[in-house]
Amino acid sequence: MQTEHVILLNAQGVPTGTLEKYAAHTADTLLHLAFSSWLFNAKGQLLVTRRALSKKAWPGVWTNSVCGHPQMGESNEDAVIRRCRFELGVEITAPEPVYPDFRYRATDPNGIVENEVCPVFAARTTSALQINDDEVMDYQWCDLADVLRGIDATPWAFSPWMVMQAANSEARKLLSAFAQHN
């Protein structure tokens, strides 16, 4: 895969340029565009993944299915599809927005900052997983209700963006409806 970049944004969310992805994530990360996705199988189970230990930010942490950064000229939906193929080797249905205006800033224990405008999508897998070990070290298919209870009881066990997304009542409602629509 070619070197990825992030699309830098001003405070109003307007693109101002690009920066190489690895260089972008530091203790002083600039605001940039990202996406987050929650993938469900035909049984309505959520794919929860554990980030590879080689990841720069939040290595080894459990999180929602796939996250990433759209490239210049690429739609968020196309970026979700691209990263699902790269990280999980999986095909998905068209991603549907569940929390389009999600924005967050969080600092991991090593001081790496995420500072993102990060629309959240849900999609259904349509093929078997073929995990990329450089991205994902473990995964589990879970009932969404169990995952949400786990997040509520032990938020420290999950990525901060997953916890913040799950805390939004409208996103939670849309994810629950998505999981129930088999």
Curated annotation (Swiss-Prot):
Residues 30-164 form the Nudix hydrolase domain. Signal peptide: none annotated. Its cofactor is Mg(2+); Mn(2+). GO terms for cellular component: cytoplasm. Its EC number is 5.3.3.2. Gene3D superfamilies: Nucleoside Triphosphate Pyrophosphohydrolase (3.90.79.10). One of its GO terms (biological process) is isoprenoid biosynthetic process. Binds 1 Mg(2+) ion per subunit. The magnesium ion binds only when substrate is bound. Binds 1 Mn(2+) ion per subunit. Mn(2+) binds at H25, H32, H69, E114, E116. Mg(2+) binds at E87. Pathway: Isoprenoid biosynthesis; dimethylallyl diphosphate biosynthesis; dimethylallyl diphosphate from isopentenyl diphosphate: step 1/1. It holds the Pfam family NUDIX. The active site is at C67, E116. Keywords: Cytoplasm, Isomerase, Isoprene biosynthesis, Magnesium, Manganese, Metal-binding. It is found in: Cytoplasm. Its main location: cytoplasm. One of its GO terms (molecular function) is metal ion binding. It catalyses: isopentenyl diphosphate = dimethylallyl diphosphate. Homodimer. This is Isopentenyl-diphosphate Delta-isomerase. It comes from Escherichia coli O17:K52:H18 (strain UMN026 / ExPEC). The gene is idi.
